[in-house]
């Protein structure tokens, strides 16, 4: 299973998946090795947890979904924040 498939099945909502796909597409291009030197964010969700450095792509996606749920409640709200501020 790919990280995109995992996210789609975890969300079970096409609208929310599209928001997440857009957000992660812009943040990391769904690259589990992505690294932002200026913010030190890593992985698919561009998180600042050192744990993400050794996590699998699926684990990174799961971490990102939990983060979004805790901070924004939905991927669409997280993506709206990203569009307004340039970060999430």
Q: What is each residue range found by the language model?
A:
Residues 1-88:
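Peptidoglycan cell-wall recognition and remodeling modules
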């Amino acid at each position: 299973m790919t990280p995109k498939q995992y996210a789609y099945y975890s969300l079970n909502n096409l609208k929310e998946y599209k928001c997440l796909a857009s957000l992660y597409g812009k943040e990391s291009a769904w690259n589990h090795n992505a690294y932002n030197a200026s913010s030190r964010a890593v992985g698919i969700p561009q998180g600042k947890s050192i744990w993400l450095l050794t996590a699998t792509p699926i684990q990174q996606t799961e971490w990102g979904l939990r983060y979004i749920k805790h901070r924004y409640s939905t991927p669409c709200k997280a993506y709206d924040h990203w569009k307004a501020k340039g970060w999430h």
